[in-house]
């Protein structure tokens, strides 16, 4: 009886559906990978024995290889979105540009991510690919950075739209008030505007969260592009935070 209640508990059901998704498994592996990256830096700084550091690095490399097939052909949805967004001229122009940059960057990023996988497997070598073998990691980081830049543009534009909308709604509410502080007869409009403001505030919080995640990921991409120099402690911590945010997003979207 207790066993049955446990198995069919809504949280367990949701967890099983969550783990059944390749996207959620990839995010969990990403969390472990960046945790290993952070621990490598931490153990090195603490002068912990070299065997422990090498073990953590080995685990990190194994996880990196395991993540790659879960992202195989992930560029295709972005290519589809690229065509869809380009054809939609009704979108806000700034959001449209941001989404085009985002999907262009991610489409090529995941393409080079596959080449990185082949490189890790030893199928892509300097003999059969020439200079690409040495450039593939940097090119992947470059296109990831382009995709993140597009996402940041979209986030900033969405924030501005929401803030402007709230400002207009507040002005409309204030215009309904008389000079003596009493309310005009159109109280229904005021209630509707307040509800819209609450919805806008929810969008603002989500966009701020997404912007924060994209900025942190940009630090990792900038390092991979060799544009900035950051230690593995900073990069590992940034990756841990963004992985947790990604896991939370997938968990919230999973229906029990």
UniProtKB/Swiss-Prot annotation:
Membership in a protein family: Belongs to the peroxin-11 family.
Membrane topology term: Peripheral membrane protein
Domain of life: Eukaryota
Protein name: Peroxisomal membrane protein PMP30A
Function: Involved in peroxisomal proliferation. Could participate in peroxisomal elongation or fission. May be involved in parceling of peroxisomes into regular quanta.
Pfam families per record: PEX11
Any GO BP: signal transduction
Organism: Candida boidinii
Keywords, ordered alphabetically: Membrane, Peroxisome, Peroxisome biogenesis
GO cellular component: peroxisomal membrane
Cell compartments where the protein resides: Peroxisome membrane
């Amino acid at each position: 009886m207790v066993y049955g209640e446990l198995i069919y508990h809504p949280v367990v059901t949701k967890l099983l559906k969550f783990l059944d998704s390749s996207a959620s498994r990839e995010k969990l592996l990403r969390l472990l990978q960046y945790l290993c990256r952070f621990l490598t830096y931490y153990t090195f700084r603490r002068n912990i024995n070299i065997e422990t550091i090498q073990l953590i690095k080995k685990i990190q490399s194994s996880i990196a290889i395991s993540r790659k097939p879960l992202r195989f052909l992930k560029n295709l949805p972005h290519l589809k979105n690229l065509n869809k967004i380009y054809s939609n001229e009704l979108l806000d122009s700034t959001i449209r540009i941001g989404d085009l940059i985002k999907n262009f960057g991610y489409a090529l990023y995941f393409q080079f991510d596959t080449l990185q996988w082949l490189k890790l497997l030893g199928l892509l070598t300097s003999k059969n690919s020439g200079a690409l073998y040495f450039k593939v990691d940097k090119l992947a980081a470059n296109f990831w950075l382009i995709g993140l830049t597009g996402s940041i543009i979209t986030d900033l534009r969405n924030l501005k739209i929401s803030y402007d909308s709230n400002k207009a709604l507040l002005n409309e509410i204030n215009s309904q008030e008389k000079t003596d502080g009493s309310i005009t007869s159109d109280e229904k409009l005021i209630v509707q505007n307040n509800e819209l403001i609450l919805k806008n505030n929810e969008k603002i919080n989500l966009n701020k969260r997404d912007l924060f995640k994209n900025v942190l990921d940009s630090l990792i991409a900038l390092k991979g592009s060799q544009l900035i120099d950051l230690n593995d402690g900073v990069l590992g911590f940034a990756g841990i935070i963004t992985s947790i945010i990604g896991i939370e997003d997938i968990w919230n979207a999973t229906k029990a």
